[in-house]
């Protein structure tokens, strides 16, 4: 069997239609993401010392999580620590 025959038989199924539309702008994607999380999450903005921000980033990277997840973890850890005092 030649290669052209193999190519025809291996791709004999129907191909799906081209579905890619216009890309969604980043601002709109972010708005949709925030809307999905609005019931369980609240926005948080803080200005902290650069060295502490760098350490937060390092801690999050070591754990393989986002900085937001690292902040949640640190807060939960502190709440548990205070409950045992």
UniProtKB/Swiss-Prot annotation:
Q: What Gene Ontology molecular-function terms does this entry list?
A: DNA binding
* Example GO biological process: plasmid maintenance
| InterPro entries attached to this UniProt entry | RepA2
| Role | This protein is involved in the determination of copy number in gene replication. It binds to the repA promoter thus inhibiting the synthesis of the mRNA for the initiator protein RepA.
Q: Which UniProt keywords apply?
A: DNA-binding, Plasmid, Plasmid copy control, Repressor, Transcription, Transcription regulation
Q: What is this protein called?
A: Replication regulatory protein RepA2
**Known Pfam families for this protein?**
RepB-RCR_reg
Chain intervals for the UniProt region annotation (Disordered):
1-41
Its taxonomic path starts at: Bacteria, Pseudomonadati, Pseudomonadota, Gammaproteobacteria, Enterobacterales
Q: Where is the composition biased (Polar residues)?
A: 1-14
């Amino acid at each position: 069997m030649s290669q052209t025959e193999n190519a025809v038989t291996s791709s004999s199924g129907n191909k799906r239609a081209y579905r890619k539309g216009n890309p969604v702008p980043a601002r709109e994607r972010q708005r949709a993401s925030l809307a999905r999380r609005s019931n369980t999450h609240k926005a948080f903005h803080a200005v902290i010392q650069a060295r502490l921000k760098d350490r937060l980033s390092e801690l999050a990277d070591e754990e393989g999580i986002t900085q937001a997840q690292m902040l949640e973890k640190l807060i939960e850890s502190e709440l548990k620590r205070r409950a045992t005092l």
